[in-house]
C-alpha cells in the first residue's frame, strides 16, 4: 500500500502496476487528476471514498489518496526465452489474449507453473489485474512464474517465431485436433478471451490453429480448463 500524492506518482514513474486507487471524495488537484487519469487509462479501478475510509487504511498523512501496488514484478519475454535456451531447455510459453477474469487468470497461472511453463504473456491493456483474488486462486504461483506484460502481442508472436518457437492457437475453430499435433519442440500456445476467443489478427500470424475435440453437446470450455488440457498434453508429449 502506498499513500500520499508524491509516493503514488513515484510508483507510477517506476513502472509498478497499480491494483486499485482510493481517492478522497470531493478532493480536487491537478496531481490527483493526473493520477486518476493514468489509472483509468490503464484500467485500474478508482474509488472515490469518504476520508474516514482512507483514515482506516492508514493513520499517516495520506493527502487524500491511497494506492495498492501489484504484488509481482513483470519480466520481459525477450530475456526469458534466451535464458531458457541457455539452460539447455526448450522454451514453453503461454500467451493469453484478453483473459480478464482474475480467478481464471489465477487458475491458469497455477496450472502453468505445475506444467513447467517458462512464461505467461499478457497484453498491457485488456488483461486481468494481478490482485489479491488472482494471487489466492493461483495458490502463490503468480509470485513464482514469469509473467511478461507486452505492448504488442503481434510483435511478441513474431519474436517467438524468430526465436524458434512454434506458436499455436487453440480454439473451437481449429482445423486439427490437439492429439494430432507435435507439441514436443519449443512452443508457445495461445488461449483466447472468455467472450471473444482469439483475435483474428493473431490467428493470421500463428503457425497452427488447433482444437480440443469435444464429443458432447457443449462446444467450448472455460479458458482455465482448456489451458490445463493443452499444457499437460505438451507435458505428456515431452515426457514421451
Language-model features: locations:
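Surface-exposed amphipathic alpha-helices with a cationic face
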Residues: 40, 157-161, 235
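N-terminal positively charged helical leader segments and presequences
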Residues: 1-83
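Active-site/ligand-binding-proximal alpha/beta "capping" segment
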Residues: 168-222
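Short, acidic/turn-prone active-site loops that include or flank metal/cofactor-
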Residues: 26-27, 51-52, 125-127, 194-196, ...
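Structured adenosyl-cofactor binding patch, chiefly the S-adenosyl-L-methionine
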Residues: 9, 14-15, 19, 114, ...
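RNA substrate-binding interface of SAM-dependent RNA methyltransferases
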Residues: 10-17, 82-176
Amino acid at each position: 500500500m502506498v499513500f500520499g500524492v508524491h509516493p503514488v506518482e513515484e510508483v507510477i514513474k517506476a513502472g509498478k502496476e497499480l491494483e486499485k486507487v482510493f481517492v478522497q471524495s470531493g478532493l480536487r488537484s491537478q496531481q490527483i487528476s493526473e493520477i486518476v487519469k493514468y489509472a483509468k487509462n490503464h484500467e485500474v479501478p478508482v474509488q472515490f471514498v469518504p476520508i474516514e475510509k482512507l483514515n482506516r487504511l492508514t493513520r499517516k498523512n495520506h493527502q487524500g489518496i491511497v494506492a495498492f501496488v501489484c504484488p509481482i514484478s513483470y519480466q520481459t519475454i525477450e530475456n526469458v526465452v534466451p535464458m531458457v535456451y541457455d539452460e539447455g531447455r526448450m522454451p514453453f510459453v503461454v500467451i493469453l489474449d484478453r483473459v480478464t477474469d482474475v480467478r481464471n487468470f489465477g487458475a491458469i497461472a497455477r496450472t502453468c507453473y505445475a506444467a513447467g511453463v517458462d512464461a505467461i504473456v499478457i497484453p498491457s491493456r485488456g488483461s486481468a489485474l494481478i490482485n489479491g483474488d488472482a494471487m489466492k486462486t493461483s495458490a502463490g504461483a503468480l509470485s513464482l512464474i514469469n509473467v511478461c506484460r507486452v505492448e504488442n502481442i503481434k510483435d511478441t508472436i513474431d519474436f517467438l517465431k524468430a526465436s524458434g518457437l512454434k506458436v499455436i492457437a487453440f480454439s473451437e475453430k481449429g482445423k486439427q485436433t490437439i492429439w494430432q499435433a507435435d507439441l514436443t519442440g519449443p512452443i508457445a500456445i495461445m488461449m483466447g478471451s472468455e467472450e471473444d476467443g482469439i483475435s483474428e489478427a493473431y490467428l493470421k500470424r500463428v503457425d497452427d490453429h488447433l482444437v480440443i475435440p469435444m464429443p458432447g453437446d457443449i462446444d467450448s470450455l472455460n479458458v482455465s480448463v482448456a489451458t490445463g488440457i493443452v499444457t499437460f498434453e505438451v507435458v505428456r508429449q515431452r515426457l514421451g
